[in-house]
């Protein structure tokens, strides 16, 4: 797993999504990109970080805001180097085209961001907050951010299910494992 954003808010995000994230980090199963040292939007820096940590299996990338720019570029480059991408969760990467041959999931802090970003690649499934929340609130508190999980049924019917950002992210993890 690979994550990026500023440290304090990222810890709040991880607390809201994963119960044992500190153990996973100690075991090397969870990598946190050091945005205090590198730009979150730098695909090259993220790619070098992934390569340096030498993951032994497919990776799931979660990125927030400008970090989505760097993450999609790094994911595509990692694949070019024969690395495996399990999926990308793009949180509030407004205006960032998301195209890849791996599962992509978009999460937005409001409906407008969700709708307008979907024009640039919506991904397999998505989530948007309703009622809308502040941009940083989505990253800080996914467990309390309510909204709609957009997905298709097995018959192709597009469906909206009420949930939280936390539950959406956990469902993505469960579907990929």
Task: Locate predicted features.
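Conserved hydrolase catalytic core segment
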Residues: 73-86
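Short loop/helix-cap segments at secondary-structure boundaries that form the rim of catalytic
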Residues: 97-102, 117
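Active-site nucleophile loop of the alpha/beta-hydrolase fold
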Residues: 89-98, 109-112
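Active-site catalytic motif of lipid deacylating hydrolases and related acyltransferases
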Residues: 1-57, 107-114, 121-177
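Short catalytic/ligand-binding loop motif for oxyanion handling, primarily in non-cytosolic enzymes
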Residues: 8-9, 69-70, 96-99
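Gly/Ala-rich beta-loop-alpha elbow adjacent to hydrolase catalytic centers
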Residues: 61-71
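Residue in the alpha/beta-hydrolase core beta-strand immediately N-terminal to the catalytic nucleophile
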Residues: 60, 86-89
């Amino acid at each position: 797993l690979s994550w990026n954003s500023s440290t304090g808010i990222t810890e709040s995000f991880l607390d809201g999504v994963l119960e044992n994230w500190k153990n996973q980090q100690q075991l090397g199963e969870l990598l946190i990109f050091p945005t205090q040292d590198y730009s979150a939007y730098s695909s090259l820096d993220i790619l070098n970080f992934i390569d340096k940590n030498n993951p032994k299996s497919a990776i799931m990338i979660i990125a927030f805001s400008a970090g989505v720019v760097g993450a999609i570029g790094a994911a595509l480059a990692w694949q070019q180097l024969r690395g495996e991408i399990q999926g990308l969760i793009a949180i509030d990467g407004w205006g960032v085209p998301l195209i890849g041959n791996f599962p992509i999931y978009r999460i937005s802090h409001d409906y407008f961001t969700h709708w307008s970003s979907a024009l640039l690649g919506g991904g397999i499934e998505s989530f948007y907050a309703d009622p809308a929340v502040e941009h940083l609130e989505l990253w800080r508190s996914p467990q309390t951010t309510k909204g709609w999980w957009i997905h298709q049924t097995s018959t192709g019917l597009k469906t909206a299910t009420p949930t939280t950002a936390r539950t959406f992210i956990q469902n993505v993890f469960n579907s990929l494992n």
